[in-house]
């Protein structure tokens, strides 16, 4: 049974997936499509967004954003099976308020609203677990660099702009536990 699963996996050319961590933490619908380009190489295209704000919040808490990414993956055995290494680029726009994100915006980040964009890239490592003929689970983590450019606003009223800033971020750029459907 195990050998049959591995041989079927080698024939896979396309995977459609959703990152369960990102979807849960950021309440963000997201979708990725991964294409086989060689026996050990794939390209993963991902997108996620959150256009929702809390209707019950008088403090204007929000995590509004869109994010896109492209990753080349090199599989150590064969694509869509086992270990892989990747190199990725990412970019997006955001409007964030009421969230304490010190790695991105500093220690006082929970007291301001940030509206801007970011672009970056990094390297990643992951492992693909076969669950059945068509279903899989994948764990992936990445580190890298992101350049952030944003306008900063006082969060109490979220109207008074206090300045425009740039920030260089080095650290985790990817964390995923993805549910995958394999297409032949």
Model feature map: region roles:
Residues 2-9:
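C-terminal segment of classical bacterial N-terminal signal peptides
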Residues 9-67, 177-184:
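Short glycine/proline- and aromatic-enriched beta-strand/turn motifs that initiate or cap beta-hairpins
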Residues 12-14, 39-43, 79-85, 115-119, ...:
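Outer-envelope beta-barrel architecture signal
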Residues 18-22, 35, 45-49, 85-93, ...:
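Transmembrane beta-barrel strands of outer-membrane/channel proteins
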Residues 35-39, 74-80, 129-133, 183:
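Outer-membrane beta-barrel strand-turn architecture
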Residues 47-65, 94-118, 146-174:
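Extracellular/periplasm-exposed beta-strand and loop segments of Gram-negative cell-envelope proteins
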Residues 70-105:
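Helix-adjacent hinge/juxtasegments
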Residues 73-75, 169-184:
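Outer-membrane beta-barrel "beta-signal"
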């Amino acid at each position: 049974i195990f050998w049959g699963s591995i041989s079927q996996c080698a024939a896979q050319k396309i995977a459609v997936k959703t990152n369960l961590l990102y979807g849960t933490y950021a309440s963000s619908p997201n979708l990725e499509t991964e294409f086989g380009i060689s026996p050990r190489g794939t390209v993963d295209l991902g997108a996620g967004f959150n256009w929702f704000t809390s209707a019950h919040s008088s403090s204007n808490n929000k995590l509004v954003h869109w994010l896109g990414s492209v990753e080349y993956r090199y599989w150590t055995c064969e694509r869509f099976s086992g270990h892989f290494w990747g190199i990725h680029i990412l970019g997006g726009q955001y409007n964030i308020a009421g969230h304490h994100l010190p790695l991105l915006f500093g220690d006082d980040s929970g007291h301001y609203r940030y509206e801007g964009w970011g672009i970056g890239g990094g390297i990643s490592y992951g492992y693909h677990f076969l669950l059945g003929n068509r279903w899989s689970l994948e764990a992936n983590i990445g580190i890298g660099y992101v350049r952030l450019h944003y306008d900063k606003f006082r969060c109490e009223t979220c109207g008074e702009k206090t300045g425009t800033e740039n920030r260089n971020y080095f650290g985790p750029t990817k964390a995923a536990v993805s549910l995958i459907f394999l297409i032949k």
